[in-house]
From Swiss-Prot:
Subcellular localization: Cytoplasm
Function: As a component of the minor spliceosome, involved in the splicing of U12-type introns in pre-mRNAs.
GO molecular function, one term: microtubule binding
Protein name as it appears in the record: Cysteine-rich PDZ-binding protein
Quaternary structure and partners: Component of the minor spliceosome, which splices U12-type introns.
Signal peptide bounds: none
Organism encoding this protein: Danio rerio
Gene name of this polypeptide: cript
Gene Ontology cellular-component annotations: cytoplasm; dendrite; spliceosomal complex
Pfam families attached to this UniProt entry: Cript
Length: 101
């Protein structure tokens, strides 16, 4: 659950740049340099799931949050009726019997 204010942050489309702007075969865009040893530099660009990333832990259940910029996981946000990103109350869950299963 995300409020209307935080929904604008999610509205970005995750697509690569156009070919000329972010082409991989140019050195100015951060691509590989000429005669670069790929074995030495590939360790920095590799994805590390347990390392320091943009994902935090949920403030309620302390589990991993699967959305960057969020403070609450989707299960806790649904149960409490709050926004997963900012924690603002979205719906009143007083008369609901909600489960996250």
């Amino acid at each position: 659950m995300v409020c209307e204010k935080c929904e604008k942050k999610l509205g970005r489309v995750i697509t690569p740049d156009t070919w000329k702007d972010g082409a991989r075969n140019t050195t100015e865009s951060g691509g590989r340099k000429l005669n670069e040893n790929k074995m030495l530099t590939s360790k920095k660009a590799r994805f590390d799931p347990y390392g320091k990333s943009g994902f935090a832990t949920c403030r309620i259940c302390k589990s991993s949050v699967h959305q960057s910029g969020s403070h609450y996981c989707q299960g806790c946000a649904y149960k409490k009726g709050i926004c997963a990103m900012c924690g603002k109350k979205v719906i009143d869950t007083k008369n609901y019997k909600q489960t996250s299963v």
